[in-house]
Amino acid sequence: MKYREVASKLRRLGCQELSRRSNGSHRKWFNPATGHATVLPDWGAKDLKEGTLRAALRQLGIEWKTFEDA
């Protein structure tokens, strides 16, 4: 799954992308419902690895099934 697809689903689930302070290939996300944040790589056209995505969702307090259904 590409970063844009992940970002779209996270927004639908109520997460917010925090403002970028500098250039780089990683973006910080915040889940207001849980108060937790995580960092996701933005690799453009390359797919995110499933383990990386699952770990980020776990840090945000989002279940995998909930994410898939979004």
Describe the role of every protein-language-model region.
Residues 1-14:
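Polyanion-binding surface elements
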Residues 36, 44-70:
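C-terminal structural segments of small proteins and small subunits
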Residues 5, 17-20, 54-57:
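Alpha-helical interaction segments
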Residues 6-9, 20, 32, 63:
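Short amphipathic alpha-helical "recognition" segments used for binding
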Residues 17-51:
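A short, structured beta-strand/loop element
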